Curated annotation (Swiss-Prot):
GTP binds at residues 17-22, 130-133. It is found in: Cytoplasm. Its main location: cytoplasm. The keyword tRNA-binding applies. InterPro entries: BipA, BipA_C, BipA_GTP-bd_dom, BipA_II, BipA_III, BipA_V, EFG_II, EFG_III/V. Residues 5-200 form the tr-type G domain. A 50S ribosomal subunit assembly protein with GTPase activity, required for 50S subunit assembly at low temperatures, may also play a role in translation. Binds GTP and analogs. Binds the 70S ribosome between the 30S and 50S subunits, in a similar position as ribosome-bound EF-G; it contacts a number of ribosomal proteins, both rRNAs and the A-site tRNA. Its EC number is 3.6.5.-. Monomer. Disruption phenotype: No visible growth phenotype at 15 degrees Celsius. The lineage of its organism: Bacteria, Bacillati, Bacillota, Bacilli, Bacillales. GO terms for biological process: ribosomal large subunit assembly. This is Large ribosomal subunit assembly factor BipA. SUPFAM superfamilies: EF-G C-terminal domain-like (SSF54980), P-loop containing nucleoside triphosphate hydrolases (SSF52540), Translation proteins (SSF50447).
Length: 612
């Protein structure tokens, strides 16, 4: 069998924040990808603003470096299971993976998720123990943990014989010896070339190119990114696109782009083993195969994990609608959601009975909150409902998504965390005492039990706990309520501006969400009640002026700091009868029915119907 020894295709996989993107930066720099005078941002592979801010990778990225006589195509993959749709498809495009594990933290839930995907594709990993220079680094123990994980995930004998490289990505060093570092990343380059198989060279056979990722460009339209599995593809070539429904469409390849560093470079042809981007077909989709017109031979369709969580997106109809956003109409919001579907194959958008609302389904809270955050930054205004898990019927049994949860917590908080997990129908799988005052707890918990849990967890552990979770499987649905918010809320009784005097008057009733000067409206949630019922309050109350005392005295009032919630915290906080109003400038919580009397009528009606 003829091989392309001048080429290697690898994916870099890891848990969030284990230094994967920084490692790729070093590989790019040390291979001489950038000119000496070229200004390159830190974490160059994270191109999206949100990726840079959060330090996570959301979209899979392609890059290529030349080391000696070998070209190495590198795919930097998302480390979060919410973007698992991307991870799975990338595994089809590569011949090996580099698994990055933190020298202190060891194996984490997302490490398990991405590694499982790689092993399922029979890929042989190269293990990189990163951050070897960290205090309390424990490389030998971490390698034992990795081996245990491989065995647990049914790795074959060849996969269990993985090579190990010890690295400090931030310092740009790597070595085969955990006790001393070389001066550069050469040990990693050499290990990749030695242990990752070269692609098969069958460029003379009929073409097979499969689309794994999508991109969109205003000039050339939709772009399919994938791998040439067989044959050669040339610019101007007339080919057939084998659609997912079995039909074929003919089109002409207008442009082929290869990858060099962080840039796409136009090329005239791509051969077996190459990873390229192709334009020319407007309705190209993930999983479809490009073949010669006279030799239609599609590859097996790529399987993509189904969504597990859904939310309703609604046109903003609050009293402040249209004030802060640029795009506020149903048409604009629908166009934006449809354009997201062009590149995000794990997303689903379904219409509802109302022309102003859509059910949007995704892989998890992070997946959907990233979409909402991007929309608000682009100038959209909308409202979203409480996230709900998607229930499936499997063999006639109602099943719900279950997650694997890993919690690292100081010993003194283990009791309260275990109790709170039990209340959310969590089952303990393992408990590991590291002997340094920290305990690792592993649970399986229904996904609906985790909605809204982050805030409770932070307060239980006083900010010292670390919570990670990833989708595990669908299991028969457990009876009864799981999780949810226990407290009621403080609801504004009228439109106005919050005042120090008004806030001070209700501080003892709960936690306040607004600061003095914040504009509020009737039905807007302005705080959390100490009790389990909702309470209507007046936060815009003014101190009465008299001859003796003027209203300016109000300025001396001292009040507690308001709790300002992020978008994710706001989404987690919601109940069924509430919306999160999202605009470019504000995130507000509100009741779906703004008027108190109408809310009470609706509650009575629901009770009468036997639904409460």
């Amino acid at each position: 069998m003829k091989l392309r020894n001048d080429l290697r295709n690898i994916a870099i996989i890891a848990h969030v924040d284990h230094g994967k993107t920084t490692l790729v930066d070093q590989l790019l720099h040390q291979a001489g990808t950038f000119r000496a005078n070229e200004q390159v941002a830190e974490r160059a592979m994270d191109s999206n603003d949100l990726e840079r801010e959060r330090g996570i990778t959301i979209l899979a990225k392609n890059t290529a470096i030349n080391y000696k006589d070998t070209r190495i195509n590198i795919l930097d993959t998302p480390g979060h299971a919410d973007f698992g749709g991307e991870v799975e498809r990338i595994m089809k495009m590569v011949d090996g993976v580099v698994l990055v594990v933190d020298a202190y933290e060891g194996c984490m839930p997302q490490t398990r998720f991405v590694l499982k995907k790689a092993l399922e594709q029979n890929l042989n990993p190269v293990v990189v123990v990163n951050k070897i220079d960290r205090d309390f680094a424990r490389p030998e123990e971490v390698i034992d943990e990795v081996l245990d994980l491989f065995i647990e995930l049914d790795a074959n004998e060849e996969q269990l014989e993985f090579p190990v490289v010890y690295a400090s990505a931030i310092n740009g060093t790597a070595s085969l010896d955990p006790k001393q570092q070389d001066e550069n990343m050469e040990a990693l380059y050499e290990t990749i070339i030695k242990h990752v198989p070269a692609p098969v060279d069958n460029a003379e056979e009929p073409l097979q190119f499969q689309v794994a990722l999508l991109d969109y460009n205003d000039y050339v339209g939709r772009i399919g990114i994938g791998r040439v599995f067989r044959g050669t593809m040339k610019v101007g070539q007339q080919v057939s696109l084998m659609k997912l429904d079995g039909t074929a469409k003919s089109f002409r390849v207008t442009k082929i782009f290869g990858f060099q560093g962080l840039k796409r470079v136009e090329i005239e042809e791509a051969k077996a083993g190459d990873l390229v981007a192709v334009s020319g077909m407007e309705d190209i989709n993930v999983g479809e195969t490009v073949c010669p017109v006279d030799h239609q031979d599609p590859l097996p369709v790529l399987r993509i994990d189904e969504p597990t969580l859904q939310m309703t997106f609604v046109v903003n109809n609050s009293p402040f609608a249209g004030r802060e956003g640029k795009y506020v109409t149903a048409r604009k919001i629908e166009e934006r959601l449809q354009s997201q579907l062009q590149t995000d194959v794990s997303l689903r958008v379904e219409p509802t009975a109302s022309p102003d609302a859509w059910v949007v389904s995704g892989r998890g809270e992070l997946h959907l909150s990233i979409l909402i955050e991007n929309m608000r930054r682009e100038g959209y205004e909308l409202q979203v409902s409480k996230p709900e898990v998607i229930i499936k019927e499997i063999d006639g049994v109602r099943c719900e998504p279950v997650e694997r949860v890993q919690i690292d917590v100081p010993e003194e908080h283990t009791g309260s965390v275990m109790e709170s997990m039990g209340a959310r129908k969590g089952e303990m799988v393992d408990m590991i005492n590291n002997g340094n005052g920290q305990v690792r707890l592993i649970f399986t918990v229904p996904s609906r039990g985790l909605i809204g849990y982050s805030t409770e967890f932070l307060s239980l552990t006083r900010g010292f706990g670390i919570l990670n979770h990833t989708f595990d499987s669908y299991q028969p649905m457990q009876a009864g309520q799981v999780g949810g918010r226990r407290q009621g809320v403080l609801v504004s009784m009228e439109n106005g501006k919050a005042t120090s005097y008004g806030i001070q008057g209700i501080e003892d009733r709960g936690v306040i969400f607004v600061e003095p000067g914040t504009e509020v409206y009737e039905g807007m949630i302005v705080g959390e009640h100490n009790r389990d019922n909702d309470l209507v309050v007046n936060v815009s109350k003014m101190k009465q002026q008299t001859n003796v005392r003027s209203a300016t005295k109000d300025q001396t009032t001292t009040i507690k700091k308001a709790r300002i919630m992020s978008l994710e915290e706001s989404l987690e906080y919601l109940n069924e009868d509430e919306y999160c109003e999202v605009t470019p400038e504000s995130i507000r919580l509100r009741k779906k029915i703004l008027n108190k009397n109408e809310r009470e009528k609706a509650a009575k009606k629901k009770k009468t119907a036997g639904l409460s």
